[in-house]
């Protein structure tokens, strides 16, 4: 086994004494930093490489801190208006995962970069920490490399905001088979429109 395989096995045993101590120290350190900050190199290099990261020019890694728990509705003094059924403020569940939220925050903060992927690094009772791999689409090293040219196209702008990353796709209910009948045709909206549109074929 190579070195990355050993590192992968270490990260799988998160309850080991060494990793528990390491994560406790790291979460304390991460809490002192800003919510979105750049890191010089990936904390988990074997995981980052599996997700597409390479130690080349044009690749950057940012660490994002996301608060755990429910999503609170951003209203002034709890004034939601409307019917009592929609008066909820505190117990609302976010449709996106915390990882997808972290990717979105990094993508908004760094608008000129493209989000490639992300992975979990640590968590405590209050926060979850993710590292997001981003690519500079205007760097010559990226534009000249056949493996990374695809992300420089305009269609991939803010792909993290449209549920096109790995974490974003998981909340869209996509897949094949009878379990995913609600999203046949690409999305829930596309599926609903197809089932609720009457088509009258012209008689010839």
From Swiss-Prot:
Gene Ontology BP terms: cytoplasmic translation
Positions with biased composition (Basic residues): 191-204
Region of interest (Disordered), residue spans: 155-204
GO cellular component: cytosolic large ribosomal subunit
Keywords for the protein's UniProt record, in alphabetical order: Ribonucleoprotein, Ribosomal protein
GO molecular function, one term: RNA binding
UniProt xrefs under Gene3D superfamilies: Ribosomal protein l15e
Stored SMART domains: Ribosomal_L15e (SM01384)
Entries under Pfam families matching the protein: Ribosomal_L15e
Keyword tRNA processing tagged: no
Family membership: Belongs to the eukaryotic ribosomal protein eL15 family.
Protein name: Large ribosomal subunit protein eL15
Organism: Caenorhabditis elegans
